[in-house]
Each structure stands twice: as structure tokens, then as C-alpha cells.
Amino acid sequence: EMFVNSYKSEIGLLNNVFIRFDVVEGDLISKFYKASNYYSESSGTLGNSCMKYKPSYYFDIYAKNPEKIKMVILYDEDGQISDGKYKSNKIMARALLWNTDQGDMVMDRIYSYQDKDVELFKRFAEKNGWWCKKTQDSECNFISQRGEENKKVKYYTISLKEFDTEYYPYVDTFAYFDPKNGILSNSQGLTDKDKSNYTHYMSNTDGTIAMTRYMDGDGDDEDDDN
């Protein structure tokens, strides 16, 4: 009985915290990249993001593809419920959410003010049936986690409808880009033909895009953050 009550209590606490989660898309993605909307502009992996002061148009490729790219955010505790939804002006954490061509919803690297919120994001992903990165880094070859399930990810693709843009964001995981067909991937591909298509790599933080022929298999900028 004590175990059951403890379990119910934990579920209740999680449900209360989950109220503060939201999934946004379009121009709201660039909004919540901005440091002015962070709970703290200088603390945690969120406050240390290298993209926090970048202009909104750097994120156009996200905003123009809402069916493929969204963002999961955790609001701070200073908000309020309006029309049944919790809203606040500041966020405690964020992570991109990718709708892959392979059918998996994958939550990317989690940027948070507090380390403990990483586990909350993983639980929120599990609740929604999404996969997430087991380790919070910029590795393209990663282990994907969903609750107790784990799998080694070799090759995901994200086919974009709108990809003609002048500026590009730094991307942690799905950084390989086929500009001819508008496809993002966490790998240059499984065949030589695939590798010849992924000619670009989103590893720069100044709005430009790198060429893969100058990059090694994992990307030279794996320690940068998004």
C-alpha cells in the first residue's frame, strides 16, 4: 500500500509539472531561442547556448517546416493558467522535436537551467511516445531512449518542404543537409550516393553553412551548443 501511494504521489507531481510543458512551432521557435525569454541568461546549458542572441531569421528553416520541426519548452513557475493552458513569459528548458521520415518522433538535445529538468523532459517524451537522446550532447551518432528502451541510431532523415533560406542555425544532431532535395540527417548516409548528396553541414553559429568535404564523420564542432 505504501508503494502504491508513493507511486500515485509521484504520478501526481509529474502531472502537475507536465502542465508547464508546451510544444510550439513556427515563429515561436525563434522566440524561445532568445535569451530574453530564458529564466536565466547565464546559467545552465540553456543560459550558455551559443544561439541565444541570434536574429530570428537564422531559424527560418525551423519556422517554415512546422510539420517536421517543433520545440518542446518548459515554462518557469511564475506563469498562470489561461483557457486551460499554462503560459509564462520565461522558459526553464527547451529541446527541438523532429518528425523523422522513419516514423519516429525524436526529441533532440535538452538545454536546461537546471540539470534535474533533463529527466523531466525524458519522462515527458516517454509519456508522449517520443524517443529522445540518452546523452545530452551534439553527437550525430547517438543512442535513443524511450523510457527503459534504448536503441542505437544510425540513420534518420527529415524531408523538408521549405528549405530555400539564406541563413542557417547551428544544429546539434540532424546537421547533415542535402540542399538539392531538402533533407536533414544525423548521418551522411549509408551509401556513397547518399554521402555525395549531403554536401553541407550545419555546424556554424554565424548563419552560414559548412561544406561536408571539410568535416570529419562526426563533425569538427561537436562541442558547440545550440
Regions found by a protein language model. Name each.
Residues 1-226:
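Non-catalytic substrate-recognition and accessory regions of acyl/acetyltransferase enzymes
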